[in-house]
Amino acid sequence: MAESHYAQIAPHLYCGPVEGAANIQISTCIPNFLILESIGRWKGFHAQILKKPVEWESGFVIPPTEPGLGVELNEEVALAHAYNEKDLHLEMAEKPFY
């Protein structure tokens, strides 16, 4: 829809590396991509939750070349920080709240 109206898009990398990987992949495939926006480079927990962290170089994200979204979840880390309906589960600090 945006492309047909000559509008550019700027996906936000705000919800962790799996959502970010989806936005990175779509950004490499569309002609009206402008910029990826992120508040960080997915260090700490967001790097640990992937078997191979997303790479950044000079402020640019390097699109993964592995199949699918290009990322593989580290299930041990994910299970150690399992979601529960009582606590906020966002990374805006060193470790997610759980």
Show where each model-derived region lies.
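Shared catalytic-loop signature of beta/alpha-barrel
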Residues: 1-68, 72
